[in-house]
Amino acid sequence: MKFFIDTANINEIREANDLGILAGVTTNPSLVAKEGVDFHERLREITSLVKGSVSAEVVALDAEGMIKEGKELAAIAPNITVKVPMTTEGLKAVHAFHQEGITTNVTLVFSAVQALLAARAGATYVSPFLGRLDDIGHDGLDLISQIAEIFHVHDLDIQIIAASIRHPQHVTEAALRGAHIATIPFKVISQLSKHPLTDKGIEQFLKDWNNR
């Protein structure tokens, strides 16, 4: 499974990139608004730093508007992936992008049939939201399993991005259940390498070394 970072903060992206694990970035309108920066300029910064897929989301709700925005975003850099919401208008836009060779990430996916629709429309990635499903008492990880099985059975060439990651266990379980990618907030990325027994082991090694 590959690691993406879910942020529009350039400093967080730099720090994660320095770890040597970062394969891509996902952004959304809320994350960009939080930064208070020009959207296109920030995308230029990110795409110059990260060579993998960088998801940039359209804000139009109609297919025509999505296609117009998406083409403008895709023109910023060759590694831009146009992020499109899972709606009927979004599916129309994804189909149009697919015909033009523009990569897409269908977001806000909460059911397996939505993921199947995205795949058939020609999406490159599909993003089921784990945490938000957990919030309403559903099992987001079960959704990953369902989508992975459907894609396998029907031999669909599309990658699953586990999104709305809340904690390290989400990452582990998503990998076990067939997600190709996890897009992770910087706070959770910072927790992935930590374990109390690792800290305890280092402390003991140093103690033994200093007492030799």
Swiss-Prot record:
Localization in the cell: Cytoplasm
Active-site residues (renumbered): K83 (schiff-base intermediate with substrate)
Principal subcellular localisation of the protein: cytoplasm
Superkingdom in the source lineage: Bacteria
GO cellular component labels: cytoplasm
Alphabetically ordered keywords of this record: Cytoplasm, Pentose shunt, Schiff base, Transferase
Keyword ATP-binding found: no
InterPro entries, per the entry: Aldolase_TIM (IPR013785), TAL/FSA (IPR001585), Transaldolase_3B (IPR022999), Transaldolase_3B/F6P_aldolase (IPR004731), Transaldolase_AS (IPR018225), TSA/FSA_arc/bac (IPR033919)
Pathway: Carbohydrate degradation; pentose phosphate pathway; D-glyceraldehyde 3-phosphate and beta-D-fructose 6-phosphate from D-ribose 5-phosphate and D-xylulose 5-phosphate (non-oxidative stage): step 2/3
Cross-referenced CDD domains: Transaldolase_FSA (cd00956)
Reactions listed under catalytic activity: D-sedoheptulose 7-phosphate + D-glyceraldehyde 3-phosphate = D-erythrose 4-phosphate + beta-D-fructose 6-phosphate
Pfam families: TAL_FSA (PF00923)
Keyword Disulfide bond: no
Listed EC numbers: 2.2.1.2
Listed GO MF terms: aldehyde-lyase activity; transaldolase activity
GO biological processes: carbohydrate metabolic process; pentose-phosphate shunt
Top-level EC class: transferase
Annotated function: Transaldolase is important for the balance of metabolites in the pentose-phosphate pathway.
NCBIfam families: fsa_talC_mipB
Family to which this protein belongs: Belongs to the transaldolase family. Type 3B subfamily.
Entry protein name: Probable transaldolase
Organism of provenance: Halalkalibacterium halodurans (strain ATCC BAA-125 / DSM 18197 / FERM 7344 / JCM 9153 / C-125)
Gene of this entry: tal
